[in-house]
Amino acid sequence: MWSELCKSFLHLTRYALCQRRADVMLYYPRHFNRSADGHNPYFAPIVALCEEHGLKWIAIEEPDDATSCPRDERSIPGDAFFFLVTALRKVIRWFAPHATCYDIDRRVARIVDALTFHRLRARRYITISNSMLYVLSELNPNGRAYDLQHGVIYN
């Protein structure tokens, strides 16, 4: 677990410092990697479309220790992002006990946005199973956030 967290932190730091912003950000729990090669078959058509049209995309894979599905080598391990968001939610809830979950996620997004030098801002965010959708939709208020599994569009 600690090695995955450190690896994830290094990937996220490298992305925040060295990469240009993505046009499309994909975020999903690891247990959706159900293909034989460890890729997420639900995002395969979206990745193909992004590559076909020259859009820069990034995939962040949420940790899931309860699954035997392998990690996708094309995605950034999302352990550091996941634990940072979880810790910030708990701290903000402690200081603002009457805040709604939307208010908390908005505050979390502002902090994460500043810590990543606005590099996680994308024009489109696509998630599966509503994972981090509120946080991602608040990273870039001008972007669009979609939940692929439930067909929900935010922003």
Residue ranges and their predicted role:
Residues 1-155:
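Catalytic-core helical/loop segments in enzymes performing group transfer/polymerization on anionic/lipid-linked
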